[in-house]
């Protein structure tokens, strides 16, 4: 019996990371010596591990985490978590002397504009990303503000910081993105940087690094970076910034 | 009324980050527009923000987070969170070809040896750190293993990785640390690096970077770093490692 448990555990442990689809299809349940974990507990650990960048490059969330993710997003914890992160960014900003070329960089999707209306129709990340469907949704220009980020955005503006939006959205979405930002309450910005489809970069991390390098060359001081993806926050050319990771338990962009 | 609320909020927002003691003395309650957050919700956000490195350099946890932290540590979530992080480290390790000079670096306190027995007598981080009392406790040599890390340690050893313990404990604790590690089930290691009190470094981050530089010079390949503090995981000379952040909602070491 002990050997069998060991064998099962070994197969589980070896098989898990080999799945291209990451967590989705593989049962997370493992004999642990302290009993089975409930989905709620396991998925809270999944979520924490995503936020602390311990779980990376997952293509879908585990199937058993659909309901816990839904509960998290729609309950008060997600908003509280967003609030705490935005507060920290504001506290940090409010302690600084503001120079005229100081910028805060914000991502767009799931940082200032919520894409939860899209994801709630697509299993909160359990389905693999479908660019066509997602683009259709983006092109509606109907994404609401993430309210805690909107508050922080307004506070940073009133402190005198300039705002740069830096997104992986392609340039053909410029008009709809501008309109959506304004509709959601983000009325002003120093720059809105979308991705030139001719620009070849290996991933979002290097694209965002390259765009930040441009900003530094233009004479801006990057004071803070706020995003829902680690690829917004890691990489080069971060200037003297502190970075702030907003919660996103639904997907990962490399 | 609206103005009054705004004024209170402004005072709260400005006053909060000015406290030397960080979160402790200041009421976290704020009018948010979506109702008051309970301590449970706020402290879960505090914890998440600490793990994702959004909250830094706190000297004590907020007073209202003592009970939620106690519940978290003593409930199954803390252990589940530790398990998930250790699993990720193992999955990552198991996909690599092992070279004879490949090492995993582990911290000691709250990474392999639990200091929860100490912290549960000191408010789970609500009291400012008392080096004398903590040293007395360390010198007992009675710290238990963190069970999920112990499992992972044994698995990494059986994959063929070498283990280096790198700790901010001072060199005078070498004997008690060796004995405590063995007593807790950590029977072997490639190196156990404690801090030379004559070595002056500005903080733990630079101390750990310097020690890693030594390891790289000695020809080791740093494959993974596992610690409960961001100062274990950030900084220079990380080789080709992936890093793994174990949960610690109780204190922060710069």
UniProtKB/Swiss-Prot annotation, chains A, B:
Signal peptide bounds: 1-20
Any Pfam family hit: Acid_phosphat_B
UniProt GO MF annotations: nutrient reservoir activity
Glycan-linked positions: 130
UniProt keyword Glycoprotein present: yes
Keywords from the named record: Glycoprotein, Seed storage protein, Signal, Storage protein
Top-level division of the source organism's lineage: Eukaryota
Tissues expressed in: Accumulates in the stems of developing soybean seedlings.
Coiled coil: none
Proregion positions: 21-35
Family assignment from sequence similarity: Belongs to the APS1/VSP family.
Reported function: May function as somatic storage protein during early seedling development.
Name listed for the protein in its UniProt record: Stem 31 kDa glycoprotein
Species this chain originates from: Glycine max (Soybean)
Lineage: Eukaryota, Viridiplantae, Streptophyta, Embryophyta, Tracheophyta
């Amino acid at each position: 019996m002990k050997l069998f448990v060991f064998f099962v555990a070994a197969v589980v442990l070896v098989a898990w990371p080999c799945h291209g689809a990451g967590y989705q299809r593989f049962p997370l349940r493992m004999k642990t010596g302290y009993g089975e974990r409930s989905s709620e507990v396991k998925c809270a650990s999944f979520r924490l591990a995503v936020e602390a960048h311990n779980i990376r490059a997952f293509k879908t969330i585990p199937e058993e985490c659909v309901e816990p993710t839904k509960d998290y997003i729609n309950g008060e914890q997600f908003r509280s978590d967003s609030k705490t992160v935005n507060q920290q960014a504001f506290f940090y900003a409010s302690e600084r002397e503001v120079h005229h070329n100081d910028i805060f960089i914000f991502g767009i999707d799931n940082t200032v504009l919520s894409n939860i209306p899209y994801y709630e129709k697509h299993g909160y990340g359990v389905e693999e990303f479908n660019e066509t469907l997602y683009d259709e949704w983006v092109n509606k220009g109907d994404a609401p503000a993430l309210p805690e980020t909107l508050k922080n955005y307004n506070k940073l503006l009133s402190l005198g910081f300039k705002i740069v939006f830096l997104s992986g959205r392609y340039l053909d979405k410029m008009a709809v993105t501008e309109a959506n930002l304004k509709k959601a309450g983000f009325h002003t910005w120093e720059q809105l940087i979308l991705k030139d489809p001719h620009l070849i970069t290996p991933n979002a991390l290097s694209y965002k690094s390259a765009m930040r390098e441009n900003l530094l060359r233009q004479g801006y001081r990057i004071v803070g970076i706020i995003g829902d993806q680690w690829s917004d926050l890691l990489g080069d050319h971060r200037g003297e910034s502190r970075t702030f990771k907003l919660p996103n338990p639904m997907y990962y962009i490399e």
